């Protein structure tokens, strides 16, 4: 082999090696949608969903894709919302308690960008600085499980006591519908009342079921809002939960706590499928892929949509 050929071959091998060591697991592909509406329902375990009382969610499920997914262990809130927004496993994001305000175990240095783990909001900001994003939530822990300063709009709706969650969740919808005027690439509507009333009265109780019904009414408002904003044909709806429950508790190692609903719906996903098993860690990578953005290697979840 001539020297020039050897040099060319070595250069090609080096290039492949460099690509393999890239910070990005997937190269960007053409987006399939312009917008993702993410609905996060705390404590909404798949085994506890009163489908016959939730027509709006049922319509999204029946008109789209559905999988019974799995969350991370322990089956608690901060651990699993971090799993969803950072798109990675507990061993990487390091959140270990239900109310962790920051990683309890330092994330691997190789996974950090600017000293922090990349989340779905920070990746959109990094790759597309002009994109508008919004995150709205009633449990303050949500703000600690994502890089809220990367979102164009972030608001926590505080209030005292378990019974304050239903009106606060409604406030999330009220403000979120206003945010649709900005045509956000990604908007999070978080709902906390299902978890709150599950703790207060038990998963599967009448008050728990009533909370699910109210959340379904809020989902209906979101759907109508997307239509009125002229975003319907270009929007993917995604609904996930952080955990289920049993009695008045969660954090347990059983399917009542592990199994969560994953709904992906909208015109852009017609003819597609979800690759199972779907994990909660797949949330952020799937959203980034839908919008045509790169998925960083730090996100150990995968794009679950094919």
Where in this protein do the model-derived segments appear?
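Bacterial N-terminal signal peptides
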Residues: 8-19
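Metal-dependent active-site segment of extracytoplasmic phospho-/sulfohydrolases and closely related
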Residues: 38, 56, 211-255, 287
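Active-site His/acidic residue clusters
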Residues: 141-158, 174-217, 221
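Active-site nucleophile/metal-coordination loop of metallo-enzymes that catalyze phosphate/sulfate
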Residues: 26-33, 45-126
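Loop/turn elements at helix/coil->beta-strand transitions in domains of secreted/extracellular proteins
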Residues: 32-36, 63-66, 127-134, 182-187, ...
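Catalytic-site neighborhoods of secreted/periplasmic enzymes
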Residues: 93-97, 112-165
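Active-site rim elements
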Residues: 69, 107-111, 208-209, 269-277
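Substrate-binding rim/cap in mid-to-C-terminal beta-strand-loop elements of soluble/periplasmic
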Residues: 85, 253-294, 305
């Amino acid at each position: 082999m001539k020297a020039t050929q050897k040099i060319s071959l070595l250069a090609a091998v080096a290039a492949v090696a460099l690509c393999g060591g890239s910070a990005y697991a997937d190269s960007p592909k053409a987006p399939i949608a312009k917008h993702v509406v993410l609905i996060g329902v705390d404590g909404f375990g798949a085994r506890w969903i009163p489908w016959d009382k939730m027509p709006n969610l049922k319509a999204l499920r029946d008109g789209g894709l559905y999988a019974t997914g799995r969350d991370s262990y322990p089956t608690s809130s901060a651990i699993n919302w971090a799993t969803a927004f950072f798109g990675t496993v507990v061993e990487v994001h390091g959140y270990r308690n239900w109310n962790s305000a920051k990683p309890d175990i330092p994330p691997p240095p190789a996974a950090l960008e600017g000293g922090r783990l990349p989340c779905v909001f920070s990746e959109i900001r990094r790759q597309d600085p002009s994109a508008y994003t919004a995150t709205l939530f009633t449990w303050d822990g949500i703000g600690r499980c994502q890089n809220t300063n990367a979102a164009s709009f972030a608001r926590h709706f505080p209030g005292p006591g378990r019974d304050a969650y239903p009106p606060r969740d409604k406030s999330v919808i009220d403000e979120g519908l206003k945010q649709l005027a900005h045509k956000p690439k990604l908007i999070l509507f978080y709902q906390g009342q299902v978890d709150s009333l599950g703790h207060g009265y038990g998963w599967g109780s009448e008050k728990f079921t009533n909370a699910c019904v109210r959340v379904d009414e809020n989902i209906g408002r979101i759907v109508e809002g997307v239509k009125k904003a002229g975003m319907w044909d270009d929007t993917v709806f995604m609904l996930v939960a952080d955990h289920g429950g049993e009695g008045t508790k969660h954090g347990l190692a059983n399917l009542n706590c592990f199994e969560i609903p994953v709904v992906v719906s909208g015109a852009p996903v017609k003819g597609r499928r979800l690759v199972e098993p779907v994990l909660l860690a797949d949330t952020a990578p799937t959203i980034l892929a839908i919008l045509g953005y790169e998925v960083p290697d730090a996100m150990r979840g995968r794009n679950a949509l094919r």
